[in-house]
């Protein structure tokens, strides 16, 4: 089993005032660094899906993949699947840049839940489809899905009968969409310190 990883960092950050979330800091460190340090050890190769100037990620030493046709997170997933397939990977594990507490066992738990097929994370009764495992075999179906104007991650996951991998810590998938979410994450860091 060859698992590759992808940090989804292509969003516009509208609820953060148009700020590039990858450039936001938590505990004095970039969000993209948090996710890279948590997801990287779980996968054979790691890349970032982002549009705009790739030089802003130069310090991480990771490949930056651009969306062919920006249509939200699934466009990034498609770019990642094509990159992973070209390198001989079996599947791609994704995590958004704004989930800095992503679990250190995300990839293996997703793999086990889906038995190598599509799987998404679930915690506290909520599904987190952007934290998912996508076999490279679904790439062309995803391309067709996007070409048909579909863009919902959960819709594509459901189309492939994605299994759900349960995680006990709700905060593991805390999504930093707004300034108050970032403040909550800072508070959690202080509690854990």
Curated annotation (Swiss-Prot):
One of its GO terms (biological process) is bis(molybdopterin guanine dinucleotide)molybdenum biosynthetic process. It is an enzyme of class 2 (transferase). InterPro entries: MobA-like_NTP_Trfase (IPR025877), Molybde_CF_guanTrfase (IPR013482), Nucleotide-diphossugar_trans (IPR029044). One of its GO terms (molecular function) is metal ion binding. Monomer. It comes from Cereibacter sphaeroides (strain ATCC 17029 / ATH 2.4.9) (Rhodobacter sphaeroides). This is Molybdenum cofactor guanylyltransferase. Its EC number is 2.7.7.77. Belongs to the MobA family. The keyword Nucleus does not apply. It is found in: Cytoplasm. Its cofactor is Mg(2+). Keywords: Cytoplasm, GTP-binding, Magnesium, Metal-binding, Molybdenum cofactor biosynthesis, Nucleotide-binding, Transferase.
């Amino acid at each position: 089993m060859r698992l590759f990883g992808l940090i989804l960092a292509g969003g516009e950050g509208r609820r953060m005032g148009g700020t590039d979330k990858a450039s936001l800091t938590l505990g004095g460190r970039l969000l993209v660094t948090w996710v890279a340090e948590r997801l990287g050890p779980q996968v054979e190769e790691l890349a970032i899906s982002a549009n705009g100037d790739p030089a802003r990620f130069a310090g991480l030493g990771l490949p930056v993949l651009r969306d062919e046709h920006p249509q939200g997170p699934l466009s990034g997933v498609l770019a990642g699947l094509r990159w992973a397939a070209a390198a001989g990977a079996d599947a791609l594990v994704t995590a958004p840049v704004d989930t800095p507490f992503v679990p250190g066992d995300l990839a293996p738990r997703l793999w086990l839940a889906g038995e190598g097929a599509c799987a998404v994370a679930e915690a506290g009764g909520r599904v987190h489809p952007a934290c998912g495992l996508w076999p490279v075999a679904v790439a062309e179906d995803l391309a067709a899905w996007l070409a048909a104007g579909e863009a919902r991650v959960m819709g594509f996951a459901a189309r492939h009968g994605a299994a759900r991998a349960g995680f006990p810590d709700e905060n593991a998938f805390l999504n930093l969409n707004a300034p108050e979410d970032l403040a909550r994450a800072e508070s959690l860091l202080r509690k854990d310190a």
